[in-house]
Design a protein with these regions (language model features):
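Domain-level signal for soluble alpha/beta catalytic cores
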Residues: 1-325, 331-427
């Protein structure tokens, strides 16, 4: 609802757009959304300020404000009720008096809010007391929490996934490439088959689901829109919208309930001209493929150069590099013997030079080879060690997941090896 409202406002006015939400005392929306997922979506939509209103009093809002300030780079709004509603002699009243309200709002400004006001139960006396209590705190240029937050986050309606720390898994199975059954399911409009693939990947440990429904002679925009809507009804995992069809991309981004990953843009000017306006309008974390008009560079340095070109062009649209993840691409070693070495070196250089997150379609490395899982799983470990933020993999592959859980345990991403023991403790 708030995404629809923000888009409606932005499409019909050039005025600043603010958005506030009602959270409960656990920091959740009534529909289950949490603070990072809300902030990620609203900042992706480029609201001018965001925050909290209604639902509770100023004291109860402070922990939620503190959490918002961990994620938000735009100014934060706080508009509490005059405490909590109570009844006396059949009449409803609020339990925070004006002077107390003013003291709480002064503390809220000190914590980092930039815009303050009142909601249910507040009166002119409450606002007057708030103004008086905060009269010496009007300079917001050095407001705590106002600094830029360099956090790469994708979200669904109720779950946020942050890239840049523990490696994440992007499930690759909702994609017709090389999958006869999936192709037939698309042709037969078998949506249940697609939903089963989503649920199985979620159960296997995926954090994000890639969604590609591209086939010849299929109305891809209509099908992509339908599949995204249906997936959102059965999984809370964020989605990666994977298409080269710009109409399909916009159809999905417009109705997507959150901040998606977008796969992809590349270094060709035509690609950036088409994709970046959609990222600017709808919000998203876009995958930048390191190829351009000259193809895929043969060297790591060449791919890093294309990555820089993508990052610089994105700036023209106000897209920060925290909303770009780079795919340095991997060529199968069956035809390009140094393909893995080049990819890993490019991966290291991109992470070091630009400080962006990185993804890879890991299984491409073994195309044309026998017993591909052995090559894939070993390369996956090497890529994670080189700085891979998220691998696009098959989470139903025992070899790949064994590599993943082992790596996380070895690198202390798995506290006390709990996940590893949970998976393999009975073996």
């Amino acid at each position: 609802e708030v995404k629809a409202a923000v888009l409606a406002a932005k499409e019909n006015t050039s005025l600043p757009v603010f958005a506030t939400m009602i959270f409960d005392d656990k920091g959740k929306l009534l529909t289950g959304g949490d603070v990072p997922s809300v902030v990620a979506m609203l900042e992706g939509l480029r609201v001018d300020a965001l925050g909290i209103n209604c639902g509770m009093g100023p004291e109860q809002m402070m922990p939620i404000l503190d959490e918002i300030l961990q994620y938000a780079s735009v100014p934060v709004i706080v508009k509490p009720n005059a405490g909590l509603p109570k009844q006396k002699d059949g009449e409803v009243y609020y339990d925070v008096e004006p002077e107390e309200f003013g003291r709480f709002m002064a503390e809220i400004l000190k914590r980092g809010a930039s815009l303050i006001g009142g909601c249910c139960g507040t009166t002119p006396a409450h606002i007057r007391a708030m103004v008086e209590a905060t009269k010496d705190q009007r300079d917001i240029t050095d407001r705590p929490g106002k600094e830029f937050k360099n956090r790469t986050i994708v979200s669904s309606y109720g779950r946020a996934v942050e890239l840049g720390g523990k490696p994440m898994i992007i499930g690759e199975r909702i994609n017709p490439t090389g999958k006869k059954k999936f192709k037939q399911a698309l042709k037969d409009h078998d949506i249940d088959y697609i939903l089963r693939e989503a649920i199985s990947q979620q159960d296997a440990g995926a954090h994000i689901l890639d969604v590609n429904v591209g086939l010849p002679d299929i109305d891809e925009p209509a099908l992509m829109r339908e599949v995204v809507q249906e997936l959102q009804s059965v999984t809370s995992l964020p989605l990666q919208i994977d298409t080269v069809d710009i109409s399909a991309l916009e159809a999905a981004m417009r109705i997507y309930n959150g901040k998606p990953m977008v796969n992809s843009v590349n270094g060709k000017q035509s690609s950036m001209d088409a994709v970046f306006p959609l990222i600017k309008k709808y919000g998203g974390v876009v995958v930048g493929l390191t190829l351009d008009e000259d193809g895929i560079p043969a060297t790591a340095e060449g791919r890093v150069k294309v990555a820089g070109k993508i990052i610089e062009e994105a700036k023209k649209y106000g897209i920060d590099k925290k909303d770009i993840v780079i795919d340095v691409l991997c060529m199968t070693i069956s035809s390009e013997p140094t393909g893995a070495i080049t990819t890993l070196e490019a991966l290291r250089q991109v992470r070091e030079k630009y400080g962006v997150c990185a993804v890879l379609g890991v299984s491409n490395i073994s195309f044309g080879l026998p017993y591909r899982p052995a090559v894939n799983s070993n390369f996956y470990t090497m890529a994670m060690q080189s700085g891979l933020s998220a691998g696009i993999i098959n989470p139903l592959s025992e070899d790949m997941m064994r590599s993943y859980y082992s790596f996380c345990a070895l690198m202390n991403y798995d506290e006390n090896c709990e996940k590893y023991i949970e998976q393999y403790g009975s073996q």
